[in-house]
């Protein structure tokens, strides 16, 4: 005990001497030291880290806490490519105080997506971002077992029979937008210019709300209610990921919008209960009939309302971005537009047949266009999990400690020539049956929301994998298929003089085209009334 006291006393004496010397310095030198010391500590820490053979190599950085945030945030795929050449498929970097361990390629997909629930957590990685937008008790603000059951509840409304009923509803909304939106007004105009990042988010939310949430909720989007969705949407930004709550105006608007929208859903739910008006019209009816967990606990109306927000907002960004990218790629490929048009005319008998869900399945080129767009533009360039227990990386000496995050990027793999020859070229025919690579579905597993492929080592994973795989894949293909079918049959489009496909904007949470992203459209049949 006396020895310990002696050591502590001696240490305090040195601290006091150092502090005295520091206070004796001129003010300018003291300020300089305060600034320099964190940088020195940061460099020393990195040097000591590099000596550890049980850690993946760390990307060197100069600015404490910030780390590699700027270069990663601006051009993530270029950042991954440079790091891969230097370190291989496994490396770490610092992102705003977090250590992110990246594992690139199909083996990385397997390592992260099929990791044990006890080892990694999506909830711990994302809850601070999603809960203020979606609300309490759903998605990532609940135990994983609850989330798996919530996905099962929602999946009950995403059946083949439901999709058959959605197709005419989605088509009706697209034609209505073509007629009434100031961006088109096709009954008054034969040509015009649009910014796809204005039109596609609107068309996506109109079609999704009409099909999934019913006529009553869709009608509200024609009022000021639409501005609430816009305010809520602005809660999905990188600054919200880093700082979930700040005393800023857009945070206050986000919180107000969440309460107002969930309150509107709750009013509709209560009205249907009161009138015993629960049918099979939409997702709201489906959740009101089937939202009891295995342990007998029922979701509250507030939780159902929050889950409805999560379903609509969760798919809104990704489908809007994908439809925008499709239009942009086709704008410089009139040959592909013509191929798609001929397929439409063939399947729909020259336009005599009404589009149906079954007929959508007979349009391989249309579906390959969606598939190729998702390959080139994965909606999310990075997917995270927080490490909860130390994880050994198979066939290496690396151990990823608890508290770190693991990061996987299927979008980066999608753009590697080793998996997709000429990967940066838009080529819908790479998916032809006689030329497309065949990826085995393999063993299936049920995480609680229905059986899905357990294999996630495929280089093509546009909807993620494992227990957090997106359940909206078939709805996305249905929605995008109807949308693009009508675009192709109704319009032709091209770029303004000197323009081409814009580069991706990686500064948002979803990979969007850099704006403005304008195309010039013209009606195929100027006399046609919509």
UniProtKB/Swiss-Prot annotation:
Pathway: Steroid biosynthesis; zymosterol biosynthesis; zymosterol from lanosterol: step 1/6. The keyword Membrane applies. Itraconazole binds at residue 314. Lanosterol binds at residue 126. Residues 1-20 are lumenal. Its EC number is 1.14.14.154. Signal peptide: none annotated. It holds the Pfam family p450. Residues 42-530 are cytoplasmic. Heme binds at residue 470. It is found in: Endoplasmic reticulum membrane. The modification Phosphoserine is found at residue 458. InterPro entries: CYP450_sterol_14alpha_dmase, Cyt_P450, Cyt_P450_CS, Cyt_P450_E_grp-IV, Cyt_P450_sf. Keywords: Endoplasmic reticulum, Heme, Iron, Isopeptide bond, Lipid biosynthesis, Lipid metabolism, Membrane, Metal-binding, Monooxygenase, Oxidoreductase, Phosphoprotein, Steroid biosynthesis, Steroid metabolism, Sterol biosynthesis, Sterol metabolism, Transmembrane, Transmembrane helix, Ubl conjugation. The keyword Acetylation does not apply. It catalyses: a 14alpha-methyl steroid + 3 reduced [NADPH--hemoprotein reductase] + 3 O2 = a Delta(14) steroid + formate + 3 oxidized [NADPH--hemoprotein reductase] + 4 H2O + 4 H(+); a 14alpha-methyl steroid + reduced [NADPH--hemoprotein reductase] + O2 = a 14alpha-hydroxymethyl steroid + oxidized [NADPH--hemoprotein reductase] + H2O + H(+); a 14alpha-hydroxymethyl steroid + reduced [NADPH--hemoprotein reductase] + O2 = a 14alpha-formyl steroid + oxidized [NADPH--hemoprotein reductase] + 2 H2O + H(+); a 14alpha-formyl steroid + reduced [NADPH--hemoprotein reductase] + O2 = a Delta(14) steroid + formate + oxidized [NADPH--hemoprotein reductase] + H2O + 2 H(+). The chain crosses the membrane at residues 21-41. GO terms for molecular function: heme binding; iron ion binding; oxidoreductase activity; sterol 14-demethylase activity. Its cofactor is heme. It is the main target for antifungal compounds of the triazole family like ketoconazole which inhibits by coordinating the iron atom at the sixth ligand position. Belongs to the cytochrome P450 family. This is Lanosterol 14-alpha demethylase CYP51.
């Amino acid at each position: 005990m006396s020895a310990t006291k002696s050591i502590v006393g001696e240490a305090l004496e040195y601290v006091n001497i150092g502090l005295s010397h520091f206070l004796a310095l001129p003010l300018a030198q003291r300020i300089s030291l305060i600034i320099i010391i964190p940088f020195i500590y940061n460099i020393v820490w990195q040097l000591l880290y590099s000596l550890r053979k049980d850690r993946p190599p760390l990307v060197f950085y100069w600015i404490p806490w910030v780390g590699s945030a700027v270069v990663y945030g601006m051009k993530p795929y270029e950042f991954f490519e440079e790091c891969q050449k230097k370190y291989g498929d496994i490396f770490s970097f610092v992102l705003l105080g977090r250590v992110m361990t990246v594992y690139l390629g199909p083996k990385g997909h397997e390592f992260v997506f099929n990791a044990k629930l006890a080892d990694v957590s999506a909830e711990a990685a994302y809850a601070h971002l999603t809960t203020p937008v979606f609300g309490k008790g759903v998605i990532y603000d609940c135990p994983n077992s609850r989330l798996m059951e919530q996905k099962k509840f929602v999946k009950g409304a995403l059946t083949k029979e439901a999709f058959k009923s959605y197709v005419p509803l989605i088509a009706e909304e697209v034609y209505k937008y073509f007629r009434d939106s100031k961006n088109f007004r096709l009954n008054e105009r034969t040509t015009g210019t649009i910014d796809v990042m204005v039109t596609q988010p609107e068309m996506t939310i109109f079609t999704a709300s009409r099909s999934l949430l019913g006529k009553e909720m869709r009608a509200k989007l024609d009022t000021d209610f639409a501005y609430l969705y816009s305010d809520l949407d602005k809660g999905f930004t990188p600054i919200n990921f880093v700082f979930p709550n700040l005393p800023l105006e857009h945070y206050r608007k986000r919180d107000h919008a969440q309460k107002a929208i969930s309150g509107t859903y709750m009013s509709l739910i209560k009205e249907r209960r009161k009138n015993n008006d629960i049918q099979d019209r939409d997702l709201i009816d489906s959740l009101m009939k089937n939202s009891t967990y295995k342990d007998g606990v029922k979701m509250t109306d507030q939780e159902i309302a929050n889950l409805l927000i999560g379903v609509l907002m969760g798919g809104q960004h990704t489908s809007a971005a994908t439809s925008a990218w499709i239009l942009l790629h086709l704008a410089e490929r009139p040959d592909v537009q013509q191929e798609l048009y001929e397929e439409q005319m063939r399947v729909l008998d020259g336009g005599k047949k009404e589009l149906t869900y079954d007929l959508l399945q007979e349009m391989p080129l249309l579906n390959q266009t969606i598939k190729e767009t998702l390959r080139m533009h994965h909606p999310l360039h990075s997917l995270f999990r927080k490490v909860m227990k130390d994880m050994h990386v198979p066939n290496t000496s690396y151990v990823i400690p608890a508290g770190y995050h693991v990061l996987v990027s299927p979008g980066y793999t999608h753009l590697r020539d080793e998996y997709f020859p000429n990967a940066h070229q838009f080529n819908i025919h790479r998916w032809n049956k006689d030329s497309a690579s065949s990826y085995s579905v393999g063993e299936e597993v049920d995480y609680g929301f229905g059986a899905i492929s357990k294999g996630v080592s495929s280089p093509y994973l546009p909807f993620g994998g494992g227990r957090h795989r997106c359940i909206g894949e078939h709805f996305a293909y249905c929605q995008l298929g109807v949308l693009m079918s009508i675009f192709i049959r109704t319009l032709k489009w091209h770029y303004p003089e000197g323009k081409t496909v814009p580069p991706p904007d990686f500064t948002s949470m979803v990979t969007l085209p850099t704006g403005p992203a304008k195309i010039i459209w013209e009606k195929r049949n100027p006399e046609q009334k919509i």
